[in-house]
UniProtKB/Swiss-Prot annotation:
This is Disco-interacting protein 2 homolog C. Residues 7-120 form the DMAP1-binding domain. It comes from Homo sapiens. Residues 170-183 have a biased composition (Low complexity). Residues 120-136, 144-157 have a biased composition (Polar residues).
Length: 1556
């Protein structure tokens, strides 16, 4: 690794590589320190600023250390000890640094996420930009890198990664999200945008598209053309305000980040992968073509490799118990095991005599002292758990051999520390499946187990009920003289079960028979050359794996002495094992590479170290390719202390195959160990290609020795049929031997796949009649029969057809500077399957003192390093606070639990970086719009195929004969006068207050008289003329109704306006002002209270109060009657104006004529069978649409009584509406979605108490949700389910549908069939097609019929582009022809160019005479098998969504609600969601119901679910507080208001993530 002093130097890559090679030669002892210095100075001399002398050229403290001791050199470089030793490799580190240096040239603009201050983990003074009122006046980091632009930092010059801090636009550390934060200067941002737009990396295929497909007809109707897509570079910063289409000022900070993200994504992407994912009936994409240049195996087919003959030595015992008996009786004083305390002093020496007698006691006690004589708890062959801590091998050994003597099967497991340990549940599953009822443990361990208040050991999560039995001598019974264990020769009974944790976290039990146990000990004895009374130092876990096989089993067979070093001692003194080797002159030591690394870190040139006694240093994790550097470094340092090169013996093992291979201790020191430098690129294709160490992406592997004695080994292809590999191919190593496991306990299917494999030759013939066992290790057999392992099957991640090993990715991440960044090297790498491919996720613990800037820079570097070295993208990189990842019992990271937490959104990261744009290369092809087939061809096609044209109509108004007296009158004002004369005391309206009591009521004559007085007031005080417009600003109630009819009596045109909210004047009053101005109201009528509010100081701050028209307060009315009541001269004149703000933020007023108003009321009267004797409960906002008509008009026309319940009253009493419905025994009721939601959420837990209060909904015949959108099935269904117990019939709940051009098209009446639900394929819908599927099929979307078509209404489905009629079940725009259509827009605020053809369109083919109104909604008609009231087949209308809400992405049409539904399902804490697009990026805003710490959990889950279900990449995820997403009175989301708020940086988000 080049010295630190070289970091600032621009050395060519080959020089750096040569330096790395020199470094390696030095570390391997090939050259001396002096030679190294000489060659090094020669190499870099040319690049030093002052050539005269190397010494002078380097600053004193940076001068290369010239010390004879390579040990201290090693120590100085690696003193941190924080990095995970398993993956330490200086060569690899050098490669990573070189790769990053390469990246320096091509800057990568990664927008830094925004965080709310409360969410920033580490608050350090320089981590924040001080709040500043300027809108980005200072240049916070320009691309040129001017001196003042670089962020200040504690380390002075940031030479190595200076670029990243600049590339992250202006946001050195702007982690807060308040609008006062400085945003990047306009110049810098502009330059950056240009740089990014022109950056050319490698000319490969373009990214999946985020910027290419803009919609062909503008999606946001209210935005002028060219407002988003056409601008090449947005205006940033300073005085210029960036604006959205309708002139909303936008914070340059948010927009700059988005622009930066867009520019970053515009760059050509590296992997030239074809998009290959085919998942739709018509998305026929080319199958991914294999890369023609990918390496393929070319060698001959490998031959199975035989190990040496297992020689039967004459004095080998017939079984392990027999060996114990022999040594226990003939050498009882011989030491068997010495345990150490935490000070390194011998704690206990177990002799063979003691082991024999204690094991006998254990065997007798478990067979005879548990349960009763007649019913013993444990019988021979039963399984028992062994639960012993890592510092008590003696107790474990006695219990283990006790079980063998009793012919009971021990199942060693870890000590459970809490009731909810990581992975503990799976251990419980193993114990349950093994039928374990007894657990053997030690006294100390038993005392340390968690206890309940009564002192009992609680049942651990997922565990069976256990009897805990302590195996200390005082708890054991001495066996009687006549009892003796049954010692027989090894047979095929199970000896013990070793647990194994799988990739998915499940725990399996590998059964090892007594024969296999004995044979394995014999094979190890032969391979390692063990002899009697040798001393062995064991640092490994003695309960499983190499530690168990050498330190507990083989040692007893050979009467060896084991010195056991507990983990707790290693933590305190990492050199302890080396000291014990010296102290006891041990011949063998069993360690892991981390123990060697720790010893190196702690080593301080101790004098008394002498390792010449060691003949074998077994490296248990030698199969991990990254262990080689620890081995090399260890040899380098301790060679001078008597350590010989041939002593280091890596081995490979697996729970299933036990020891797979081990390097033999040779006496020939001239034969160097085998090593190979392999191309990582080749390895990803499973091919062995030898490379040179100069290359960046290479993996250096060491051999793990030869095949075990008595075994045969081969390698087979990792997937599919177990076919033999070629000689230059990587495969899964398989072993055929006696000394292996035999099955997974109780799992015959999995056992067959692993333990009964018959490798095949290329011709398909099996190579042996005996089964082989899969080892789970990936590797190959090299020259000379040496076995090499390159990784594990469990760590394999197959991304886009290439195989990557998790360990390799970890090694690269840990080699990224600063190496100390990852806390104690705690990092987890795994893959998650998203959209039919595996995606790499990296989770790391960050140091407690890391700033946001540090984290972000480190993450950016990791992405680049992995991209360079492995040529693979990282899907998600998450950082969590130190010490928060789930741990395994030995302190490692519990991988499957970490993955589980990530997937369920409970990982709580403090930083997240998602890169879906880089990684996801298998999206379906963007839809290419085909040239439209002409409307005539479509019609002919339908006729030929026998499909009817999609048109339908309600009953004909003219043909219905009923005794409708109101029909005689053309105008509603006349109907009211008639009712006041004929039925003066009939109550028309009853208004309820929040307690459910009657607040007010109106009879026909009272309403008539009040209307007269208001008419007088308008004429006398207001001096209004016939046809003047009057704004009615009233709360929902009776005053509003009276004012409306007063206007009609005076000949004025009323406009109902929602009054401003007293607590929120700033945002609600401007809308009132706008409607009053746009409607050209000459006068404003209201109550005294609101009158004061309109002129208050708060109002003056929000609007110009001087420009209000005349304001009349109707609390004080004149006494006299009008001279005459105005009668309109023509039914087509204006009756009233209906103003409403659409969900796209457009204010539109429609004109309703007197004729249309009367026809509307008549249609509803017929559909709902309304008569004077009926009562209808209405809980709706009375300001627009059907809500206004039901509240103000219908009762006067039909004569029924309306019970009015203002929706705002439900906020204080959610049960008000339903209690009123029950109390008045109402049969028909109308509500809005917001009311239904309020009841569902607010009364969910109160149904029992409501039942007790006598709430009864059994009389309800129709409960209609008034809506202008697709029916919300989930809400209506949960409402029906919830109140079913209170008598509500599910069939009663339905929805209506109306829009601006016709306020009510459908409404479920009293007769006719129930609304039907169909399931359509969501993917087909995106292509504007309807494809009906079965319920529950993938990608199915339920659509409920929007009620029944009203009388007098005709509907046709037309193509919105060609205006041609479409066939049945085809998706198109809903066109409507009806007497109650609105007669046109009065004004549209937001888009003046909205054509009049909305109201008078004609079909381009077919019936070209009828005039239709275009609703702007997509839907389809479907003729059902059901029968209508008139005996004909019923036509159902299904509404899909509004055209102007739909988003066109990748050439497909998406309805926001579908994406939002998926996102809300993604995590329990998401309460609401809204999506919109910005510069063709999809922005998802989610409301978080939980702690702010959960905010970042949502980012990956939201990204995943949208990818999986909609094939879209989310560009920005914004996490906000509850209630931030604006919702209008109809319960619809105001997505465009939200969008403007986001871009103006007004949302105060908790977190904003910019996905890369």
């Amino acid at each position: 690794m080049a010295d630190r002093s070289l970091e600032g130097m621009a050395l060519p890559l080959e020089v750096r590589a040569r330096l790395a090679e020199l470094e390696l030669e030095l570390s391997e002892g090939d050259i001396t320190q002096k030679g190294y210095e000489k060659k090094r100075s020669k190499l870099i001399g040319a690049y030093l600023p002052q050539p005269p002398r190397v010494d002078q050229a380097l600053p004193q403290e940076r001068r290369a250390p010239v010390t004879p001791s390579s040990a201290s050199r090693y120590h100085r470089r690696r003193s941190s000890g924080s990095r995970d030793e398993r993956y330490r490799s200086d060569v690899h580190t050098e490669a990573v640094q070189a790769a990053l240096a390469k990246h320096k040239e091509r800057k990568m603009a990664v927008p830094m996420p925004s965080k709310r201050r409360s969410l920033v983990v580490q608050t350090s003074m320089d981590a924040y930009t001080p709040p500043d009122t300027s809108s980005g006046s200072e240049d916070e980091g320009s691309v040129q890198g001017d001196s003042q632009g670089t962020p200040t930092s504690s380390q002075g010059s940031i030479n190595m990664e200076h670029w990243i801090s600049q590339a992250i636009h202006g946001s050195t550390t702007s982690t807060t999200s308040s609008s006062s934060t400085q945003s990047g200067g306009s110049g810098a941002a502009h330059r950056l945008a240009d740089v990014m737009a022109q950056t050319h990396i490698e000319n490969h295929s373009a990214p999946p598209d985020v910027t290419t497909y803009t919609s062909e007809h503008s999606i946001q109707v209210e935005r002028p053309q060219g407002s988003t897509g056409s601008r090449t570079a947005p205006k940033y910063g300073n005085a210029e305000l960036m604006e959205t289409g309708d002139g909303v000022p936008v914070s340059s900070r948010v927009s700059a980040k988005i622009q930066q993200l867009v520019n970053t994504l515009k760059r050509p992407k590296r992997p030239p992968l074809r998009e290959f994912f085919v998942d739709d009936f018509e998305e026929l994409l080319e199958v991914q073509q294999p890369d023609p240049n990918q390496p393929k195996p070319e060698g001959a087919q490998m031959l199975a490799m035989r190990g040496e003959q297992l020689g039967v030595v004459t004095n080998w015992p017939p079984s392990l118990e027999a060996a114990l008996q022999r040594w226990g009786t003939i050498s009882p004083k011989a030491p068997c095991l010495t345990t150490m305390d935490t000070n390194g002093k011998p704690l206990y020496i177990l002799t063979y005599g003691k082991l024999w007698t204690r094991s006998m006691k254990v065997a007798y006690s478990i067979l005879h002292k548990l349960g009763t004589k007649q019913e013993p708890m444990v019988r021979p062959g039963d399984r028992v758990a062994l639960v012993f801590p890592n510092n008590d091998p003696a107790a474990f050994m006695a219990a283990f051999y006790g079980c063998l003597l009793a012919e009971v099967v021990p199942v060693p497991i870890e000590v459970p520390l809490t009731r909810k340990d990581a992975g503990s549940q799976q251990i419980g599953f193993l114990l349950g499946s093994c039928g374990v009822t007894v657990a053997l443990t030690s006294d100390a361990c038993h005392k340390g187990l968690p206890k309940s208040p009564t002192g009992e050991i609680p049942q651990f999560k997922g565990w069976p009920k256990l009897l805990w039995f302590v195996t200390e001598s005082k708890h054991l019974s001495k066996p009687p003289r006549d009892w003796f264990p049954h010692i027989k020769d090894a047979n095929n009974d199970t000896a013990y079960i070793e647990y194994k944790t799988c990739k998915d976290g499940s725990v399996l039990g590998v059964t090892v028979t007594r024969t296999a146990l004995l044979t394995h000990c014999q094979a190890l004895t032969q391979a390692c050359g063990y002899t009697e009374a040798e001393t062995i130092v064991n640092v490994l876990d003695f309960k499983k794996d190499v530690g168990l096989w050498h330190g507990i089993l083989t040692s007893v067979m050979n009467m060896m002495h084991v010195i056991s070093i507990p983990y707790s001692l290693m933590k305190v003194n990492p050199l302890s094992w080396i000291q014990k080797v010296c102290q006891y002159k041990a011949k063998v030591a069993c360690v892991k590479s981390r123990d060697m690394h720790w010893a190196l870190v702690a080593h301080r040139d101790q004098r008394d170290i002498n390792l010449s006694s060691l003949r074998m240093l077994i490296v248990a994790d030698g199969a991990n390719p990254w262990s080689i550097s620890s081995c090399d470094a260890f040899l380098n340092v301790f060679q001078s202390k008597g350590l010989r090169q041939e002593v280091i013996c890596p081995c490979a093992s697996s729970p299933e195959a036990l020891t797979v291979a081990i390097r033999r201790p040779t006496d020939d020191s001239n034969q160097p160990p085998g090593r190979g430098v392999l191309s990582m690129h080749g390895l990803t294709y499973g091919v062995i290609r030898v490379d040179s160490e100069e290359k960046l992406s290479v993996l250096t592997v060491q051999d793990v020795g030869l095949v075990m004695p008595g075994a045969i080994m081969c390698s087979v292809k990792p997937d599919g049929v177990p076919q033999l590999c070629r000689t230059d191919e990587i495969g899964e190593l398989c072993v055929c031997a006696v000394a292996t496991g035999t099955s997974y306990y109780g799992l015959s299917g999995m056992t067959k796949n692993t333990f009964e494999v018959f490798p095949m030759t290329s011709s398909g013939a099996p190579i042996s009649e005996y089964p082989f066992i899969r080892t789970g290790l990936l590797g190959f057999v090299g020259p000379g029969g040496l076995v090499f392992v390159v990784g594990k099957m469990d760590g394999l991640m197959v991304v886009s057809g290439r195989r990557h090993n998790a360990d390799d990715i970890v090694a690269t991440a840990l080699a990224v500077e600063p190496m100390k960044f990852v806390y104690r090297g705690r990092i987890a790498v795994f893959s998650v399957t998203v959209l039919h491919d595996e995606r790499i996720v990296i989770v790391a613990e960050q140091r407690p003192d890391s700033t946001e800037e540090d984290s972000f820079q480190w993450m950016s570097r990791v992405l680049q390093a992995i991209d360079s070295i492995h040529q693979v993208g990282v899907y998600c990189l998450a950082l969590v606070p130190a010490n928060t990842l789930p741990k395994t019992p030995l302190g490692g990271i519990h991988l499957s639990e970490t993955k589980q937490l990530f997937l369920e959104g409970s990982l709580h990261p403090c930083n997240v970086l998602m890169c879906p744009h880089t990684c996801v290369t298998n999206l379906p092809k963007p839809r290419q719009k085909q040239p439209e087939i002409g409307p005539a061809s479509v019609m002919v096609g339908n006729l030929v195929s026998g499909k009817r044209i999609a048109q339908a109509s309600g009953r004909d108004l003219g043909q219905i004969e009923d005794n409708d007296q109101a029909r005689k009158f053309l105008f509603l004002s006349e109907v009211l006068q008639w009712r006041a004369q004929t039925t003066p005391d009939h109550i028309l309206y009853t208004l309820l207050n929040c307690r459910g009591a009657i607040a007010n009521s109106l009879t026909c004559v009272q309403l008539h008289k009040r209307a007269e007085k208001i008419a007088v007031m308008l004429m006398e005080r207001g001096h209004l003329q016939d046809g003047d417009h009057v704004a009615l600003v009233y709360p929902p109630g009776i005053d509003l109704i009276a004012a409306f009819y007063g206007c009609l009596y005076a000949g004025c045109v009323p406009i109902t306006v929602r009054p401003p909210h007293p607590q929120n004047i700033a945002t609600t009053l401007p809308t009132v002002k706008m409607i009053v101005e746009v409607s050209r109201s000459a006068c404003l009528m209201t109550t005294q209270l609101i009158c004061k509010l309109l002129r208050s100081r708060e109002a003056a701050a929000a609007v110009d109060v001087r420009t209000w028209p005349l304001i009349l307060d109707t609390d004080d009315l004149p006494k006299k009657r009008p001279a005459q009541i105005c009668k309109p001269c023509n039914p087509d004149t204006l009756a009233y104006l209906d103003f409403s703000v659409s969900t796209t933020g457009m204010l539109a007023g429609v004109k309703m004529s007197h004729a249309a108003t009367s026809a509307f009321c008549r249609s509803i009267k017929l559909q709902c069978e309304l008569y004077p004797s009926r009562e209808v409960a209405i809980c709706l906002d009375p300001y627009c649409g059907l809500g206004f008509v039901l509240w103000c008009l219908c009762s006067v026309y039909s004569g029924h009584q309306s019970i009015l319940i203002p929706p705002s009253e439900l906020e204080t009493n959610p049960a008000l509406w339903l209690l009123a419905v029950s109390q008045y025994k109402v049969r028909d009721t109308f509500c809005s979605y917001s009311v239904m939601e309020l009841c569902t959420k607010g009364l969910g837990s109160q149904t029992e108490s409501l039942k007790a209060r006598g709430l009864d909904l059994s009389r309800v015949r129709t409960c209609v949700v008034v809506a202008e959108e697709r029916p919300r099935i989930a809400l209506t269904q949960s409402f029906s389910k919830l109140f079913k117990d209170l008598g509500l019939h599910p069939r009663a709940v339905s929805t209506s549908f109306g829009c601006r051009v016709n306020l009510a098209i459908c409404l479920q009446g009293t007769s006719g069939p129930d609304p039907t639900t169909v399931y359509v394929d969501m993917r087909a819908l995106r292509h504007d097609r309807v494809r009906l599927v079965e319920r529950g099929s993938p990608h199915s979307l339920p659509l409920m019929e929007s009620g029944k078509i009203l009388p007098g209404v005709r509907i046709i489905i037309a193509n919105p582009e060609t205006k041609g009629p479409l066939g049945d079940s085809h998706l198109g725009e809903i066109w409507v022809h009806s007497a109650h259509n609105a007669s046109g827009y009065f004004t549209i605020y937001g888009d003046e160019s909205l054509q009049s053809d909305h109201f008078n369109s004609r079909l381009s083919f077919g019936d070209t005479q009828t005039i239709w109104a275009r609703t702007g909604y997509l839907g389809f008609l479907r003729r059902t098998e059901l029968t209508d009231a008139n005996g004909e087949r019923h036509d159902a209308l299904y509404v899909v969504g509004a055209l102007d809400e739909a988003m066109e992405l990748r050439g497909m049409r998406y309805h926001p609600i579908d994406i939002e539904t998926s996102v809300i399902r993604a995590h329990k804490s998401v309460t609401e969601c809204a999506v919109f697009t910005w510069t063709n990026l999809l922005v998802v805003v989610v409301e978080l119901d939980g702690s702010e710490q959960e905010a970042l959990d949502l980012v990956p889950l939201v990204t995943n679910v949208v990818l999986e279900e909609h094939y879209l990449i989310v560009g920005v995820v914004v996490v906000v507080d509850i209630g931030v997403i604006p919702i209008n009175s109809r319960g619809e989301k105001q997505r465009m208001h939200l969008r403007d708020g986001f871009l103006a940086d007004q949302l105060d988000p908790i977190y904003v993530a910019y996905n890369m």
